[in-house]
Amino acid sequence: MQKLKQQVFEANMDLPRYGLVTFTWGNVSAIDRERGLVVIKPSGVAYETMKADDMVVVDMSGKVVEGAYRPSSDTATHLELYRRCPSLGGIVHTHSTHATAWAQAGLAIPALGTTHADYFFGDIPCTRGLSEEEVQGEYELNTGKVIIETLGNAEPLHTPGIVVYQHGPFAWGKDAHDAVHNAVVMEEVAKMAWIARGINPQLNHIDSFLMNKHFMRKHGPNAYYGQK
């Protein structure tokens, strides 16, 4: 697990490097599917002092199997997403400014241009609000459940992120570094959408044919973006 702990540590350290977190407002995890184990950031540990050995290993029930610290308070959310979405290898949660602003406004981040379409096939959805019962009960687990509910039948890697109403963004990918990459993109397109709608409040969504072209040339069966 040492290699995965190092990867998760590096991915967590990318969050302040890319300006996605303030203080300890974020966490990254990754899963070893063969072993059924998840590595996640410890709860409340400052990035300035954190080390790879501080990463916490939990099983799929959330039981700590390795590590001196308590795991992130959002662990149950991560675990629910891993259980329900077999294609996910890494998950990120932040309170990055612009994506969180859309979450607090209760609005999906609209697909307005090709930067968005290169990564997200359509709007980045916003979940419904959790009920008082859901919050007072198993809050973090129910956060994961409302994310799954909002995704519906969508392929998670075609919509590699979501904003949770009144909370903030979650992003994911094939591994921890891919998840962070998608979290960075989500924050950037959230900022772009906010600026663009400020310039033109009547701005329409990107044309569907342009959306399809940009997403499929990177992620479709006949993708040709980048090097093989």
From Swiss-Prot:
Cofactor names from the entry are: Zn(2+)
Q: One biological process GO term for this chain?
A: L-ascorbic acid catabolic process
Q: Which GO terms describe its cellular component?
A: cytosol
Q: Which residues catalyse the reaction?
A: D118, Y225
Q: How is the cofactor bound?
A: Binds 1 zinc ion per subunit.
The pathway this protein participates in, as annotated, is: Cofactor degradation; L-ascorbate degradation; D-xylulose 5-phosphate from L-ascorbate: step 4/4
Instruction: Cite the GO molecular-function annotations of the record.
Output: aldehyde-lyase activity; L-ribulose-phosphate 4-epimerase activity; zinc ion binding
Q: Which CDD domains match?
A: Aldolase_II
Instruction: Give me the reactions it catalyses.
Output: L-ribulose 5-phosphate = D-xylulose 5-phosphate
Give binding positions for substrate. G26, N27, S43, G44, S72, S73
Matching InterPro entries, A to Z? Aldolase_class_II_sugar_metab (IPR050197), Aldolase_II/adducin_N (IPR001303), Aldolase_II/adducin_N_sf (IPR036409), UlaF (IPR023499)
Q: Give the EC number.
A: 5.1.3.4
Induction of expression:
Induced by L-ascorbate. Repressed by UlaR.
Q: Top enzyme class of this protein?
A: isomerase
Which keywords fit this entry according to its UniProt record?
Carbohydrate metabolism, Isomerase, Metal-binding, Zinc
The UniProt annotation places Zn(2+) binding at D74, H93, H95, H167
**Family that this chain belongs to:** Belongs to the aldolase class II family. AraD/FucA subfamily.
Task performed by this protein: Catalyzes the isomerization of L-ribulose 5-phosphate to D-xylulose 5-phosphate. Is involved in the anaerobic L-ascorbate utilization.
HAMAP family xref list: UlaF
Recorded protein name is L-ribulose-5-phosphate 4-epimerase UlaF
